[in-house]
A protein has these predicted regions:
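Short cysteine/histidine-rich zinc-coordinating motifs and their immediately flanking basic loops
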Residues: 105-111, 261-268
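Short, cysteine/histidine-rich loop/knuckle motifs that typically chelate Zn2+
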Residues: 96, 252
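Bacterial N-terminal signal peptides
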Residues: 9-17
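Bacterial N-terminal signal peptides that target proteins for export
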Residues: 1-10
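Sec/Tat signal peptide C-region and signal peptidase I cleavage site
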Residues: 18-22
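Flexible coil segments in periplasmic/lumen-exposed cytochrome c-class electron-transfer proteins
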Residues: 23-92, 134-141, 145-249, 284-319
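Extended intrinsically disordered, low-complexity coil regions enriched in Ser, Thr, Gly, Ala
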Residues: 112-141, 268-280, 284-293
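Cys/His-rich metal-chelating microdomains
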Residues: 100, 256
Length: 319
């Protein structure tokens, strides 16, 4: 009886542990969700401007899902319709979320310089449902799924070729720090709390736009500071360069300096918050598809701290 009782106790502990793992919640800092009472500020009609641009746009215009605010059209090739205007009623302009030439932000992907085949595969995965997110009720995800379902093959090909043609550039500064501004969620990303104050960074990445008003205006030249825990970049470098018997180093697949390798995407200089979400989604089985098989063995044993470090390291590199 004592042996049976001990076995039952062990089984109960194992089940409790498995249940706790199954109920693990995705980190709120990585998957910001607007609070229930969140409201966008009203448009007072004042024209908005950004540096080095003669364009003037209102808040209503920069919030239009069927419009890509193009403050600096000389920075990139001509936008295809799918990127610049979309197609009503349900094909939103790619450049609305990802910005005019694709740098995106912490809330979504940086598309600059990704291979056209990779971009097309991701849209196919969103459309088929094999690529999901650990938090599905975020607008960046729901809009992407709806767009992928609505886009024709020709529209997908045109958008993919456009973003693939854009040369990647640095938009991220990774900063190791013990304290960060207190933050609130605004439109699916973090901003400094208007009330001010700081707090320990803990086990988080706190990525903020360097000019919040330009970010609201969807200026593709806006830059970001990704605050990460001290030691993250070096820890990430060591993790990225380590290879085991079953898992290659990161650059074995993603190329030297993590700049990409054919249809395998470059990771260098991309949003650490976004990269963390992808690692987390792979580990928890919600991001699947043809390219997932190679990633799953690489992430299955990573802790949250490991994923933060890898994302910080990749984000710190020159694209």
């Amino acid at each position: 009886m004592k042996r049976l009782s001990s076995l039952l106790s062990i089984a109960a502990l194992l089940l409790a542990g498995a249940s706790a793992f199954g109920q693990e919640k995705p980190p709120a800092w990585a998957y910001p969700v607007n609070p229930p009472d969140f409201k966008v500020p009203p448009d007072d009609g004042t024209p908005r401007k950004v540096p080095d641009s003669n364009v003037a746009l209102t808040l209503t215009q920069v919030r239009d899902l069927f419009f890509s605010p193009d403050w600096h059209p000389a920075d990139h090739p001509a936008q295809p319709d799918a990127v610049g205007r979309g197609r009503k009623p349900d094909l939103y302009a790619c450049g609305f979320c990802h910005r005019a030439d694709g740098p995106g932000g912490p809330e979504n992907a940086n598309l600059m310089g990704l291979s056209a085949n990779y971009i097309k595969q991701q849209l196919a995965d969103f459309k088929s449902g094999v690529r999901k997110s650990s938090v599905m009720n975020r607008a960046p995800m729901t809009l992407k799924v709806k767009l992928a379902a609505a886009a024709s093959d020709e529209e997908v090909s045109a958008a993919a070729a456009y973003f693939a043609s854009v040369k990647p550039r640095s938009v991220i500064h990774v900063k190791e720090t013990e304290s960060v501004p207190k933050t609130v969620v605004a439109a699916w990303y973090l901003v400094a709390d208007p009330g001010g104050g700081t707090e320990p960074i803990g086990e988080r990445i706190i990525e903020l736009g360097d000019d919040p008003e330009r970010f609201i205006s969807r200026d593709a030249r806006v830059t970001f500071t990704a605050n990460v825990p001290p030691g993250s970049v070096e820890k990430g470098r060591q993790l990225a360069s380590a290879a085991t018997g079953t898992t290659p180093s990161c650059d074995a697949c993603h190329g030297a300096g993590l700049k990409g390798n054919g249809d395998i995407p470059g990771l260098a200089g991309r949003s650490p918050t976004y990269l963390f979400r992808q690692l987390y989604d792979y580990k928890h089985g919600v991001r699947a598809g043809p390219m997932a098989a190679a990633m799953i063995p690489s992430v299955e044993k990573l802790s949250v701290a490991d994923m933060i470090a890898l994302a910080a390291y990749a984000g710190s590199l020159t694209p």
